[in-house]
């Protein structure tokens, strides 16, 4: 009685419940894809997964079961009464009737497992079906690169699938034969019946063909090898190993047939000899002889013999990371830079980023978080036209942090607190007298101090929006707090899925594991449920075959709406001769810009690199998913920028693969590296500047290089971001016969400056935390300017204030309260007052003597007051300013 009840319970527990959960997840995913307008993407993937899964599982089942049933029909009159296996002893007559049902059940289980594996290969199958020709062939075997990107992965999967199918069939049939008595271990040895031998012979002959196919495919794998000095197939691979594998691909089926013939006839010598020959040939041709050839011929003449293969590695790595488009131009540094030239590059100076991301995030959090349940997760860098000026800005969205809600309950977390509110935006270089950032946009509701307006400040979809919410309910949503009380709002967007039936309520309740969705009286037929709100997970759900940047950035479009832009990358592990990254990727393109509306969650994927061969195939598979870049609204195009992450990858490769001469490459004569400050590599940084030979400033991404194991500069790499110039990259190389200071050398000079080191020591002794910001190398005309901000905080949790700016040029290193004053000390002259700060500036070089005398007296009096107060750092500062004024008077 108990067993009869237990069976349906176990069936429900292990079969029905998981199946329903699986179907429920598919249903909610389907509604999500319909909501975002990409239902065809969902169905394409679903049909592919289903079809491939059924095909893989069905073929295995159709092959395994007939073999099993054939083996089960065999009769062996001399079989013993018992089946013995170690301590197990079963009566044969009672066991034989169970073979068929249990065997079929086992076959079904294996087929189900293989079907699930097959369903996971949907992407490789669709890439193969929609493959395109790249137009470039590999230099060794002569296959089009498209074969490696789109065909080879599937062929290797099929090889593994056939191997598994034949081995599983062989093991299952041998087990059946053993149970039926066709295989027996006796005192005379192992006895195998004739039918068993012949059946096994056929399976092994088929298996040898699959092994031969494996040898054939292994030949293509040689093109991914690591030779130490370079990547790809080398001299020994091409002249020995490739020939060996080709030979093995032909002789293995012959060996398999001989083995099968020997097994069929019961000639054991013929059974053992063929596999021994194949293994011996493999060991000699793939291990022994290549090692000897490498040691005695190649190693002594490596450069001469490996030069063509090194050249292949250079060419294909440059293709794999799109390095071929990088234009290398000489940059002849001039250490003479006048005040007039500084003035001519006023826009560059105004846009030097003084505010570092980490201190600014901390400052924004303390000044603009407004309430504890709001959070600034990240600070983004972008450019806008601000009051008619092309300006670089720092921007951070004010998101809702559910972890910091004062009262955590389902109504608060799901119905009332549904979204973040607005952004904080400010210039990259301007500071108040207190050392704090200035703002273009601040507060809740948003107060705009520039001509940038935010008309839709609500953030329902963001980096911190990890859970579902339900909007348009009877409960008003919290919008923002005021001095007189909270302001409420009601969602008015098209995002989310309508919860307009009891069935949908029940399904969502089951999916999110809460009965409150069904029981809540606040949810109406007009209510909508917003889920998959985390923007990174949202786009990954829609396009799982793309890799997405870990740092989405928010923009304000020309209509005042908040949009997220996320860089997306196509990638492959299969480009021959290309050096791989740590994770194995050896082909990468930033081909897609994903845009997510922060209010309604609408997603668009724009093609930023139409020449990417991988994206061409994905666009064939999912034609409704991608839009051309021309379709992007102009209000968003002006905020598209070259990917920070992709330039990092390109720079890491270009540091070696800018050397296109195989001899120079082999000897590493001109190897570069990304400069290291402290224990951290410098990262690319955005800035606005006028590139050499250009007439106006533009938004660029910049990164310097140093020669390997040296601290001076070798080059600087820049990627352009604006308009038609988007994606153009240049490497400006410095003369190799001259010393150009690198960031680490400038850092050492800063530390050796007695005045600066004294000031830093004084601040640290007073308990303040000194935070040294990022050092920026800013090219101006034909010169280089080095800028590093200094932040002071009362303690580790204190408010960081930008208190000093260090500027280095040539042999001079100065530290002043503002960038303006530092530049005046080095170059003299008077720059526009609004350049970097709202603080007082140094006297004009052309001021009247009477004005300078009054300024000198004022500085002297302030210095005396500082001395009386014991403020020695302030005293030193005033004396330095007095010295500056006296020098002006002397002129």
From Swiss-Prot:
InterPro entries: UPF0182 (IPR005372). HAMAP family: UPF0182 (MF_01600). GO terms for cellular component: extracellular region; plasma membrane. Belongs to the UPF0182 family. It comes from Trichlorobacter lovleyi (strain ATCC BAA-1151 / DSM 17278 / SZ). It comes from the Bacteria. Keywords: Cell membrane, Membrane, Transmembrane, Transmembrane helix. It is a multi-pass membrane protein. It is found in: Cell membrane. Pfam families: UPF0182. This is UPF0182 protein Glov_0814. The chain crosses the membrane at residues 6-26, 51-71, 102-122, 164-184, 202-222, 244-264, 266-286.
């Amino acid at each position: 009685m108990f067993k009869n009840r237990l069976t349906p319970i176990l069936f429900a527990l292990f079969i029905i419940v998981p199946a329903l959960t699986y179907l429920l997840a598919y249903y909610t995913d389907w509604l999500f894809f319909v909501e975002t307008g990409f239902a065809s993407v969902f169905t394409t993937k679903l049909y592919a997964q289903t079809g491939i899964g059924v095909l893989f599982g069905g073929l295995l089942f159709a092959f395994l079961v007939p073999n099993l049933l054939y083996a089960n029909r065999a009769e062996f009159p001399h079989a013993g009464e018992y089946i013995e296996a170690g301590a197990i002893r079963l009566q044969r007559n009672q066991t034989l009737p169970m073979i068929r049902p249990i065997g079929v059940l086992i076959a079904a289980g294996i087929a189900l497992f293989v079907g699930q594996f097959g369903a996971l290969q949907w992407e490789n199958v669709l890439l193969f079906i929609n493959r395109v020709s790249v137009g470039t062939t590999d230099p060794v075997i002569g296959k089009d690169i498209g074969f490696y990107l789109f065909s080879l992965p599937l062929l290797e999967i099929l090889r593994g699938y056939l191997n598994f199918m034949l081995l599983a069939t062989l093991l299952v049939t041998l087990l059946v034969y053993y149970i039926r008595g066709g295989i027996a271990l006796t005192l005379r040895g192992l006895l195998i019946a004739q039918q068993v031998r012949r059946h096994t012979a056929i399976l092994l002959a088929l298996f040898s063909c699959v092994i031969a196919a494996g040898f054939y495919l292994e030949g293509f794998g040689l093109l991914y090898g690591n030779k130490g000095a370079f990547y790809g197939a080398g001299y020994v691979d091409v002249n020995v190993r490739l020939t060996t594998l080709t030979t093995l691909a032909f002789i293995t089926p012959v060996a398999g047939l001989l083995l099968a013939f020997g097994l069929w006839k019961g000639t054991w010598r013929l059974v053992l000899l063929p596999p021994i020959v194949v293994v011996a040939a493999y060991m000699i041709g793939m291990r022994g002889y290549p090692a000897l050839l490498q040691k005695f011929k190649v190693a002594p003449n490596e450069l001469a013999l490996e030069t063509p293969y090194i050249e292949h590695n250079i060419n294909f790595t440059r293709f794999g990371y799109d390095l071929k488009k990088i234009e290398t131009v000489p940059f002849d540094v001039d250490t003479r830079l006048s005040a007039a030239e500084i003035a001519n590059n006023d826009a560059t100076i105004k846009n030097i980023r003084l505010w570092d991301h980490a201190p600014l995030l901390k400052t924004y959090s303390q000044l603009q978080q407004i309430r504890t349940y709001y959070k600034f997760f990240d600070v983004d860098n972008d450019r806008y036209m601000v009051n008619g000026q092309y300006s670089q800005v720092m921007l951070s969205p004010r998101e809702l942090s559910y972890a910091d809600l004062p009262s955590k309950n389902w109504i608060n977390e799901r119905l009332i607190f549904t979204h973040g509110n607005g952004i904080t935006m400010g210039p990259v270089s301007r500071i108040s007298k207190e050392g704090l950032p200035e703002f273009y946009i601040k507060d809740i509701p948003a107060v705009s101090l520039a001509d940038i307006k935010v008309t839709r400040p609500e953030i329902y979809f963001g980096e911190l929006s990890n859970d579902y919410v339900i909007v348009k309910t009877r409960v008003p949503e919290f919008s923002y707090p005021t001095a007189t009380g909270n302001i409420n709002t009601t969602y008015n967007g098209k995002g989310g899925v309508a919860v307009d039936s009891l069935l949908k309520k029940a399904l969502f309740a089951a999916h999110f594991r809460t009965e409150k969705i069904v029981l809540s009286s606040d949810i109406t037929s007009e209510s909508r449920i917003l889920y998959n709100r985390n923007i990174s997970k949202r786009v990954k759900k829609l396009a799982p075959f793309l890799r997405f940047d870990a740092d989405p950035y928010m923009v304000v479009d020309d209509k005042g709406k908040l949009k997220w832009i996320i860089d997306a990358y196509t990638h492959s592990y299969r480009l021959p001769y290309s050096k791989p990254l740590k994770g194995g990727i050896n082909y990468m393109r930033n081909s897609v810009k994903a845009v997510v509306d922060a209010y309604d969650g609408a997603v668009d994927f724009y093609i930023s690199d139409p020449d990417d061969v991988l994206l061409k195939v994905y666009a064939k598979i999912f034609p409704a998913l991608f839009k051309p870049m021309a379709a992007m609204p102009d209000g968003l195009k002006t905020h598209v920028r070259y990917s920070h992450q992709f330039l990092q990858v390109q720079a890491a490769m270009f540091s070696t693969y800018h050397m296109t001469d195989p001899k120079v490459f082999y000897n590493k004569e001109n190897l570069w590296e990304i400069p290291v400050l402290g224990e951290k590599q410098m990262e690319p940084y955005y800035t606005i500047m006028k590139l050499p030979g250009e007439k106006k400033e533009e938004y660029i991404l910049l990164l310097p290089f140093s020669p390997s194991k040296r601290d001076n500069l070798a080059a600087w790499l820049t990627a352009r971001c604006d308009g038609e110039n988007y994606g153009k990259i240049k490497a400006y190389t410095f003369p190799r016969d001259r010393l150009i200071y690198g960031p680490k050398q400038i850092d050492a000079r800063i530390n050796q400056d007695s005045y600066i080191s004294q000031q830093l020591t004084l601040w640290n002794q007073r308990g303040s935390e000194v935070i040294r910001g990022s050092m920026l190398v800013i090219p101006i005309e034909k010169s280089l300017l080095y800028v590093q901000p200094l932040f002071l905080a009362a303690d580790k949790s204190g408010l960081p204030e930008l208190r000093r700016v260090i500027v280095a040029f040539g042999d001079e290193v100065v530290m002043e309260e503002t960038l303006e004053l530092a530049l005046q000390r080095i170059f003299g002259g008077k720059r526009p007052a609004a350049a970097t700060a709202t603080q007082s500036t140094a006297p004009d070089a052309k001021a009247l003597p009477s004005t300078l005398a009054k300024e000198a007296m004022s500085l002297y009096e302030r210095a005396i007051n500082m001395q009386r107060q014991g403020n020695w750092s302030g005293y030193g500062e005033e004396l330095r300013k007095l010295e500056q004024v006296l020098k002006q008077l002397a002129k």
